[in-house]
Every structure is written in C-alpha cells, then in structure tokens.
C-alpha cells in the first residue's frame, strides 16, 4: 500500500496497513530537523514517511511570500510584517486594505489566474500524485474577509454594517469558488477549506451570525466542489472549539475535520459522535505536548490516539498546527515518529 492509498483508505473509514501521518513545521523546525537527521531540508518529508503533500493557495499564502523581508504587501493589498519571538519569527497582518466599511464597494479582487503557488501545485500533482495524497487549499470565507477588512472591523460589520458585510462575503465566496475549481482541476485528492471560527472554549461569532453569513455560502461552495469532482474529499479546518456548528458542517458534506485540538474538543467524544461520518486529521497537541511536553508525554498522547481514534480508520495523525521551535520540539518530534513506527501498524494492538 503506498502513501496515497493509505491516506484515502483511512479517510474513507477503513483500516490501512499503518496509520497515515502528516506534520507541518515552521522554517526553524524544518532547519533543525535537517540538522538533527543530517539530511537536506527538501528530503525531510520523505525521510519522515509523511503520506501527503499540502500546497496552499489563496489569501493565506501571504504568510509565506518572503521570509527575508521585514514587511511586504501582497497581491490582495494586505500589508504584512515580520514578528520575532524567542525561537524565530512569524508573519502577521499589519494593515488591511479596506479601512472603512464602504471601501468594499470599490475594492478590486486579484485575478484567480495570478495565484503565485499554482504552478507548484501542478508540479506536485504531476510528480507525486500517484504515490502520495495531494491536499490543495485553502478556500476561505470568514478569514479571507477579515484579512481584507481587519479582524475587529469585520466583526463589527457583521452587526452594524450588514449590507457591506454581505457584499464583501459574497465577493470573497465567488473568488474562492473559482479558486477551489482551479485546485480541484489540478488533480488533488483532498480539497482543504475552512475558517478559524473557534476560540479555545467556543465560537468567535454567534451561531446566529454563522447561519446568516457563512452557513449558506459554505453550502454553496461545498455542493459545487463535490459536483465538480465526484468522490472529492473535503477537509475542513478550524482551530478551537466549534462544537456548536459541527453538526452543520457534517450535514454540508465535510468529510474530514482538522486539526482537532484536544484542549478545545475531546477527540474521543468526536469519534463516538461523528466517527461514522467524519474522519479526523491532527489530534496531537501542539500547544503543550509537542512544544513544552516531555518525550513521555508525546509517546503517551500518540498511543492514546492510536488506541481511541485509529481503530476502524478515520485518522490522519499529526500535529494540530505547524510545529514551532522550542527547547523540546526536536526531541519530541523524534519521539512522535518513533512511537508511530513502533505502534502504528494495523491492527492497532497497543
């Protein structure tokens, strides 16, 4: 069974030969793993036996355009700046392009044909699509909208400037519909969509706002994506606790939930409640276990997921976000992969 077969088998709720695995890393962690294993950075995913390739297009690739600059403006007109931390840096939005609610009426969206990473996606699909599961994203509505308007401003618009908010969200949806079609047509197995609607303990917005602005538009997008490619797997990303809208997402046709942060939603509860209809991608805590925990903590958490979530299929195991650098991160990642190699074969017997 090759990696592609392994992932697709698991996400269709059957047991493959072993648990499929995928992790993503910050640049600092990828560099440190390269040194730790004494291999080139470009070979890390192969060496660690990752079963997927993920290529992200759309508004989110503003995070990745140029790590060498202190700041830059992307094709959406979003100004980004580099923020340093103890172990490296990350990019965050400094200035959104839509300063006032009425600015949405004059904003010109970029052309979807100008997506800067589309050629990379085509290359990955052509070169690796037979052997590895290809995940293409990221289609967004809520986050794409607030990236343009600013987080607080957009939340206020959802209450106080509804006409402008609906106008913006409609145009964001249409862009992402076209983007999703391009990603699907490239040949991906899994379309990666979603919005961070969750905080640590609940939703950022009310269920009423979800139903007014976002549910009907996600319904349109998902229906069109599945019509475009029957059998397409839809993976929906939202950090945090989104239990209040999870029934809606399942009804809309979401196949996979990512990242399933265990401090926010109990993976075992989700498996019991949704395990026949929803597969899970992630579940290994990046806030504490991989970042601050011990190797024993990592081993115990991996074994717990193998015991409770992996049986019957339905699990793509990995971290719940990009693994960030810390004093423990590299040793903990090595422990993660060693534990998976030792205990991750089906039938799971730990």
Predicted feature descriptions by range:
Residues 1-26, 31-39, 73, 82, ...:
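Active-site loop segments of alpha/beta catalytic cores
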Residues 83-104:
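Short, surface-exposed, low-complexity cationic segments
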Residues 52, 56, 61-62, 85, ...:
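Extended, non-catalytic scaffold segments that flank or surround catalytic motifs
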Residues 32-65:
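Segments that shape or occlude catalytic/ligand-binding pockets
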